[in-house]
């Protein structure tokens, strides 16, 4: 083709689509963001009819052209793509326009291909499928011919285009018929009428697919006609006609421009590239262009092949990770995929024998359903979790007005209805035939979730009752045990039954019948009530046996003894006059205290019948029973039960401790009598008054003493009145502290001086004598 810097071969002679088309677009537009602001134009016509020459003159492209002086032969092979932003107009030969991509299609009816019309048909169909404007280039003398003006080819192209793209009713293509070498003898209007009549006749004879029976040519195409003078004989007029044609392409005024919004595919360049490639692949693999009507013997093979292609298309477009939280989104996507697949199948397979076509269609639908079930199951798993979480949330919300069993029934029905509605949406849209397995699985999961929440609610109710019973025991029964009477256990059991009854009152249905409102049967409710009473008796057992230990029993006896010993029947403190009175009170108080020892040691009613729980008790640790026989470390068996509180040895030790403390109390009482009987006699005070009267009168009669006494009294009064004791005491303390510090320092100085004198004395030199000198002096003296 010569220089091809500004054009690439979009489809080569081997019918292969150029994979570097997108890079070519990027090279053309560079860094500009073109978006959808571009147009695509194709030219179609007989070989050597001047198509490339027209494009070069009109759009300033550089497509190779034929040198007629040398030889008339095929110049354009395949489909070539060029780019321009300049167009020839009457005003300017280089008028700037939007990006135009021009397709130069290999000419039809060429000697090189002979009777092989497969490529020219596919090329024409491809040009119609991807272009906004298709220029049909023909000579004036070809008008009225059937083969010469490509009407037979246009019929085939129209038919296949209608079957493949008939559903795109919102898209049109402009067919611009350019009549070349128009000498003006036959008016353009006459040529236009002839061509329109031929096109309408072709359209009416088409085998239209379902849904397009009543469609017309103008539903899919707009028709425009123009004429160009002879390029060689009338070159100036030819260029003028070309520029007039350029005005229509460059104009942006509605009604005058060749471009309309409905012509555009509304795809960015990269999207258009993909679209063009897909269109060519679809056209290239559409074997119906070259095959006659299929026989019934091959119908099954063809429909199966088309079915596999349709399923492959679905799998190709199926998202790898399809996660939709909304039902409408998922259903819409799946419905779109199914429609795409079945439409692909129906488009091609419906042309074959209907029974075979329908059988394979049902098989294809079943395969689609199996694929959809995988995605729907994942979606339903997410919805199950959400619904079960909502059930749990509804059941955990506190509501005093609505019983739990009512909430559970309502929540279960709400969740089950919501899930069934989800399933109904999928089946109603015919995405799947049935989802009974998923429905059954959700019902089981829902029952399990409700059962779990029921157990939790029951556990909370039992714990709440146990806490209420435990609180009542600690408050009410503690007081009874701390202040025991002979009918202690009658009162304890009465209070205990009252506490249990109050705690379970809201669940009582009838006498000895209870409903814990979690959906249990009558028998199960009775078992729960038995468990509640067992917990209550266990709490009472642990509290009684924990409180009435040996030390606490001694304290209770001591308190009971002291209340009787120290206070009279009017709760007034006793004033002892003699030891006999103390001894009598001691005897009575001791008997009063010890009379409840048996009561505190053994739990029995006023009829002396041991108290036995009406349900078995357990400690909660491996169901260890709190009652019955047990073996101690020495291998001796003992009876363990609710009524047995203190053993005989514990009672004996408690009595000994109590007597020891009671004796101490008596001794203190007797000592108080001794202190009151050894006080100073009254006559001593009388003697002090008589003998000291004179001294008292001396003080009273001395004015100095009286004045000093008055001053001190007045001073003390005002100090007290003004609340000055604190400052005075602080001042006195400060003065005393300073005095002490000063005296301490003086004493330290004196001691330091004495120490220094002693040191100096010890350091004075002393006269030393040798033993020989002493001997000499001794001898001298003797002589």
UniProtKB/Swiss-Prot annotation:
Lumenal side: 701-703
Membrane-related topology note: Multi-pass membrane protein
EC number: 3.6.5.-
Keyword Endoplasmic reticulum appears in the UniProt entry: yes
GO biological process, one term: endoplasmic reticulum membrane fusion
Domain GB1/RHD3-type G: 35-265
Transmembrane segments: 680-700, 704-724
Segments on the Cytoplasmic face: 1-679, 725-783
SUPFAM superfamilies: P-loop containing nucleoside triphosphate hydrolases
Signal peptide feature range: none
Region: Disordered, residue numbers: 752-783
InterPro entries in the cross-refs: G_GB1_RHD3_dom, P-loop_NTPase, RHD3/Sey1, Sey1/RHD3-like_3HB
Molecular function GO labels: GTP binding; GTPase activity
Major localization class: endoplasmic reticulum
Protein name, UniProt field: Protein SEY1
Protein source organism: Lachancea thermotolerans (strain ATCC 56472 / CBS 6340 / NRRL Y-8284) (Yeast)
